Amino acid sequence: MRMCLLVMLCVLVMGCQQATEQTQFVGTDITGADFGNTLKLTDHTGKPRQLSDFKGKAMALFFGYTHCPDVCPTTMADLAHAMKLMGKRSDEVQVLFVTLDPERDTQQVLAQFVPSFDSRFLGLYGTPEQIAETAKNFKVFYAKQEQAGKSGYTIDHSAGVYAFDKNGKIRVYIKFGQKPEEIAHDLELII
């Protein structure tokens, strides 16, 4: 009888452990963070946007720029791949790309760049002041680095993605380099 109870207890503990593992984010859990609560920009279709426009959908918010040689296109491609992996559930997620380069990333440039990864993705832009205010609100670092050459400059910037649940609450910081399968996992947990 004792052996039977011991075996049942072990099975119960293992079951609880598996349930816990399945509900943990791969990215950094930032549930309850007191930043990243305001955004007022314009999307690449010309429509004014704020975070509350997307309530009812999970959101993945990335700050970057279209002339970025590596981090930005890689992150956008990884987000697009994650959306494909999610199948129909991806309809419950809105991906937002906020430009950190309002000088070059016009509405027209964003309208070509952002949907090239997934037609549902939205690019957001604003004045340099609006971008600075939004980046500060999300604790995003960015700095223009002058360079010789055709583009004239690059922008050093934070490289993670902020994920919000359907209630508009910030939940996860998805680190640069997280695999599409891991991104999909984290997004599915907050849908």
Label for each model-derived stretch:
Residues 74-134:
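Structural microenvironment flanking redox-active thiols in thiol-disulfide oxidoreductases
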Residues 20-52, 77:
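N-terminal "domain-start" segment that seeds a small globular fold
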Residues 190-191:
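Short, hydrophobic alpha-helical segments
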Residues 12-15:
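C-terminal motif of bacterial Sec signal peptides marking the signal peptidase cleavage site
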Residues 130-186:
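Thiol/disulfide oxidoreductase modules built on the thioredoxin-like
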Residues 36-37, 59, 158-160:
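Short loop/turn microsegments at loop-to-beta-strand junctions
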Residues 51-73, 79:
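Short active-site neighborhood of thiol/selenol oxidoreductases, capturing the structured segment around
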Residues 2-7:
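Sec-dependent signal peptide recognition
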